[in-house]
UniProtKB/Swiss-Prot annotation:
The keyword Membrane applies. It comes from Xenopus laevis. GO terms for biological process: axon development; mitochondrial fission; mitochondrial membrane fission. Pfam families: Mito_carr. Solcar repeats lie at residues 92-183, 307-412. Residues 29-50 have a biased composition (Polar residues). This is Solute carrier family 25 member 46-B.
Length: 414
């Protein structure tokens, strides 16, 4: 389990001076050049920038970085009227592109991909299925059958609960980091102690999220044919009831939360490590292959700066894809353990117009692995893998469309 979300939300503030942190006085005026007195020298260390929202795909400046200068002469006077308008237009295009690209990435990962996630989970927990749905074409066919018999809502069920789980994860991480002083992020010069504390924080977050993730999983896989639409806060109520052993009575085969915690934390930590490592490697190779560019002026500066967004999007895409593929067998086992004993009835992924109950009797992680291997074979761990192919194909198409739109915006800005 690895919710896709922004790592931080510090991109909505001014950074670069004490005023940007709320400690000092307001600068004399706000333009694309730093304010200076008549006796100032060519030192530009006291400059400030405004950064776009820190959402996936944006490239914020951090402490110690400097914004590109539009003029090389340190003794130049105030900008002319035309130059000021050009800088303002370039800044607007920069903000629009950063926000639009990040918004497109968030939409793809959390909204457009949700039908694929629903089918992927249903196939993973359906131990009755004879068709393993390994091909993307079979996934598209079953999507059509579900939509035809149950309507479009059958592919979007449980989407609200996934956002609730992400919100709980973000809130828990922030509160735990505040009270335990465990690092939420690693600096460039990290050591083993910081790494251990950071992974410990992630593990504690997954422990807290486990009961709510289990409730969200039930909402995404249960059939719409025999179940009414759940409320927005049902995920919270079910998660709290699972912790306190209250609410709807479950089967005796329901596994305790302690049994579910280990595979959930293991999957979350491994997913985070793999995705973070691949993301940094992809960015490193892209930066190594790209030749360094000299500071440009006008629309060329906007073009060069906005092109920095796409390596990050590509790195996020590759990181998520590799982590999902490598950990797919573990995810299948984890979902089967979570769904056992919850009296959940899912759609028949072989036919698309019937329902089947979940009546597994796994005793734990090891028993689940051995049972799947014995009864369904090695490919049983990859049931529904075609949904992953469809999901990331759609993601790649959206990235390409976003790049085309971005190029058109830059050409128009010129």
């Amino acid at each position: 389990m690895q919710p896709r979300r922004p790592d931080r939300f510090d991109g909505l503030e001014y950074r670069g001076t004490s005023w940007g942190r709320g400690d000092g006085d307001v600068p004399p005026y706000q333009s694309s050049f730093p304010a200076r007195s008549l006796s100032s020298s060519g030192d530009l260390s006291q400059q400030w920038v405004t950064s776009p929202p820190d959402i996936p795909g944006s490239r914020n400046l951090h402490w110690g970085e400097k914004s590109p200068q539009y003029g090389a002469d340190s003794n130049a006077g105030p900008p002319a009227f035309g130059e000021e308008n050009s800088g303002s237009s370039g800044e607007q295009v920069n903000r629009f592109a950063g926000f639009g690209i990040g918004l497109a990435s968030l939409f793809t990962e959390n909204v457009l991909a949700h039908p694929c996630i629903v089918l992927r989970r249903q196939c993973q927990v359906n131990y009755h299925a004879q068709n393993y749905q390994l091909s993307p074409f079979s996934i598209v066919n079953i999507m059509y059958n579900f939509t035809k018999t149950q309507g479009p809502r059958a592919l979007w069920k449980g989407m609200g609960s996934t956002f609730i789980v992400q919100g709980i994860s973000l809130g828990a991480e922030g509160m735990l980091s505040e009270f335990t002083h465990l690092p939420r992020e690693l600096s460039h010069k990290w050591n083993l102690k910081q790494l251990g504390g950071h992974l410990l924080l992630k593990g504690l977050v997954y422990v807290i999220v486990t009961p709510f993730y289990s409730a969200s999983l039930i909402e995404t896989v249960q059939s719409e044919i025999i179940h009414d639409n759940p409320g927005i806060l049902d995920c919270l109520k079910e998660g709290i009831g699972r912790v306190l052993n209250l609410g709807v009575p479950y089967s005796k085969r329901l596994l305790p939360l302690l049994v579910l915690t280990f595979p959930t934390v293991l999957h979350g930590i491994l997913h985070y490590i793999i995705s973070s490592t691949i993301q940094k490697c992809v960015l490193f190779f892209i930066k190594k292959r790209s030749p360094p560019q000299l500071p440009a002026e006008g629309s060329n500066a906007v073009q060069n700066k906005l092109e920095d967004y796409f390596p990050e999007l590509l790195a996020n895409f590759a990181a998520s894809l590799c982590a999902d593929v490598l950990l797919y067998p573990l995810e299948t086992v984890m979902h089967r353990l979570h769904i056992q004993g919850t009296r959940t009835i899912i759609d028949n992924t072989d036919l698309g117009h019937e329902v089947v109950p979940i009546n597994t009797q796994y005793e734990g992680l090891k028993d689940c692995i051995n049972t799947i291997k014995r009864e369904e074979g090695g490919l049983g761990f990859y049931k529904g893998f075609g949904a992953v192919v469809v999901q990331y194909t759609l993601h790649a198409i959206v990235l390409q469309i976003t790049k085309i739109i971005y190029s058109s915006v830059v050409q128009t800005a010129r």
